[in-house]
Structures are given as structure tokens and as C-alpha cells.
């Protein structure tokens, strides 16, 4: 596996490749990330991964400085997955001058849910993903359903900008107790880690309620938020949306069996966790 930080060197290395499968990450790799590499290999060759902690998608009071950076461990994991190239640029490589041009998602998708609580987050994501796509020029790229809204925004962005990249969705990987794998799980204290699976269990109860015939979605959402709050969480949102566009479903759509997803974000102590379940 070649480890490359220069954009020009990356382009030289990949010249002539027309089936490249790309997996962008911020590093601190876990089994969830590695499952993305394996899925990428099913859809293209060679597999290219990137590791870049993107300052543009962090707010002023978020965890950019303390976000875990474990490059040497990550390299060893990617070598075992037979990744062809790891693109690991420095901030100067990616942004040699201030990044004044941004890619802004539409408010109907980028300004809701995560976008409401993390202003500017998706503009940062879209900007860096577009730039990474320009560098790697993949045929396919793999994104996890763990970040459901991000997946949808990136897919729509590629469609609307006519980027010749197919976006592949990967299922969320969970620990044995149901907690969705995340690099931020390492922030949890021992007691918080024991409590953390309650987020997934709460989403399961919401899903069961919908599948059981409950049509008052607001009641399901409020009950779920109250349940987490009683256990010491600080919920940002628990919301049932259409899978197609993350808009709240109408009564007619509910009766017609519209495919849904329930999404959540909540703080446990100082750690903000997100999760979702398709219904």
C-alpha cells in the first residue's frame, strides 16, 4: 500500500485507473470503516482510502483539536485490507490557501436535523468530498448509513453536479450490545459506555411503534426523547422521516407504507452520539 499526501502524486499514481473505488474517512479506523473497504472492493478496483480530519466541518466549539488521530495504527489496518493507496494529506496539502469556495447543500436537506444543530457542517462535508473526488476521480465511493443524512446529501450532490461517481451505501456496523461503531465512542467514560446502547434500543422502540400501527409520530418521538432525558441524556432530536428525502411523512404516506427512517442525536455526558434505523 502506498501512502501519499500530495495531490499531484496521487493523480500520477492513479492515472489510467477507471474502476477506482474510494472510501473517504477521518481516520481512527474501526471495524465499521474496514467494512466499507471490503464493500468497496466488491464494486471496484483498486480501492483507495483517504484520511483527513477536515477542519471545515467542525464548529468553533466542537472537537477538531481532540479528534483522535491514529495514522500509524490506521495504516496497519488498511494494509491488512489490501487497500491500494491511502491518501493522507496534511491541511496544507488540501487547503494550501484559504478555502473561499464552498459547496452548499440545499436547506431542505442540509439545514435540518444535523444541519440545524451543526450549522456549516454539511457545507464543510460537501466541500471536502467534492475536492477529494476531484483528486481521486473514483468510479464508485462508499459511505456508511451510520451518517444517514450525510449519505443522502453526498448522493444528491453527485447527481446534481453530474459527478461521474456512484455512491454505495454501507450498512451500520454495531457492537454486540447494539451501539453503532463510531470514532467518538472512545470519548465515553466506562459508565457512559454501559449506557450508550440505550440510544439504539430507543430507536428500536420507535420503529416497533410505527410497525405496530401507531400513527401519532409526534407522540412516539416525544416519548423517546423523554425516555432518554430521564436516563441522563440530552437529546437534540429523534425524528421519523421519509427515506427518500428526509421530509416528515404525511398521513397518506404512512398509510401507503412509505419507507421511513428514524434518526437521532443525543449527548451522553460530553459525547454527542448519532444513530438511525430504517423502518
UniProtKB/Swiss-Prot annotation:
InterPro entries recorded: Cyt_trans-like, Pantoate_ligase, Pantoate_ligase_C, Rossmann-like_a/b/a_fold
GO CC terms in record: cytosol
A molecular-function term among this protein's GO annotations: pantoate-beta-alanine ligase activity
Positions annotated to bind beta-alanine: 57
Main location: cytoplasm
Protein EC: 6.3.2.1
Signal sequence extent: none
Active site, per annotation: 33
Catalyses which reaction(s): (R)-pantoate + beta-alanine + ATP = (R)-pantothenate + AMP + diphosphate + H(+)
Similarity remark: Belongs to the pantothenate synthetase family.
HAMAP family tied to this protein: PanC
Function of the molecule: Catalyzes the condensation of pantoate with beta-alanine in an ATP-dependent reaction via a pantoyl-adenylate intermediate.
Name of the molecule in the record: Pantothenate synthetase
Species of provenance: Burkholderia ambifaria (strain ATCC BAA-244 / DSM 16087 / CCUG 44356 / LMG 19182 / AMMD) (Burkholderia cepacia (strain AMMD))
Amino acid at each position: 500500500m502506498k501512502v501519499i499526501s500530495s495531490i499531484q502524486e496521487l493523480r500520477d499514481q492513479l492515472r489510467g485507473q477507471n474502476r477506482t473505488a474510494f472510501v473517504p474517512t477521518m481516520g481512527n479506523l474501526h471495524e465499521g470503516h474496514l467494512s466499507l473497504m471490503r464493500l468497496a472492493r466488491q464494486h471496484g478496483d483498486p480501492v483507495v482510502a483517504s484520511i483527513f480530519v477536515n477542519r471545515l466541518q467542525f464548529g468553533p466549539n466542537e472537537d477538531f483539536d481532540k479528534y483522535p488521530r491514529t495514522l500509524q495504527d490506521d495504516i496497519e489496518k488498511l494494509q491488512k485490507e489490501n487497500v491500494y493507496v491511502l491518501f493522507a494529506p496534511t491541511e496544507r496539502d488540501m487547503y494550501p490557501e484559504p478555502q473561499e469556495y464552498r459547496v452548499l447543500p440545499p436547506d431542505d436537506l442540509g439545514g435540518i436535523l444535523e444541519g440545524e444543530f451543526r450549522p456549516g457542517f454539511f457545507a464543510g462535508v460537501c466541500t471536502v468530498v467534492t475536492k477529494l473526488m476531484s483528486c481521486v476521480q473514483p468510479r464508485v465511493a462508499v459511505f456508511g448509513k451510520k451518517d444517514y443524512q450525510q449519505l443522502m446529501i453526498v448522493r444528491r450532490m453527485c447527481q446534481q453536479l453530474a459527478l461521474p461517481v456512484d455512491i454505495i451505501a454501507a450498512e451500520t456496523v454495531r457492537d454486540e450490545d447494539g451501539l453503532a461503531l463510531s470514532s467518538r465512542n472512545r470519548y465515553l467514560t466506562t459508565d457512559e459506555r454501559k449506557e450508550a446502547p440505550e440510544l439504539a434500543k430507543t430507536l428500536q422502540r420507535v420503529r416497533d411503534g410505527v410497525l405496530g400501527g401507531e400513527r401519532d409520530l409526534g407522540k412516539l418521538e416525544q416519548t423517546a426523547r423523554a425516555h432518554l432525558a430521564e436516563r441522563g441524556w440530552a437529546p437534540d432530536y429523534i425524528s421519523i422521516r421519509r427515506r427518500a428525502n428526509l421530509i416528515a411523512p404525511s398521513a397518506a404516506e404512512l398509510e401507503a407504507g412509505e419507507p421511513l427512517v428514524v434518526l437521532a442525536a443525543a449527548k451522553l455526558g460530553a459525547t454527542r452520539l448519532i444513530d438511525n434505523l430504517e423502518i
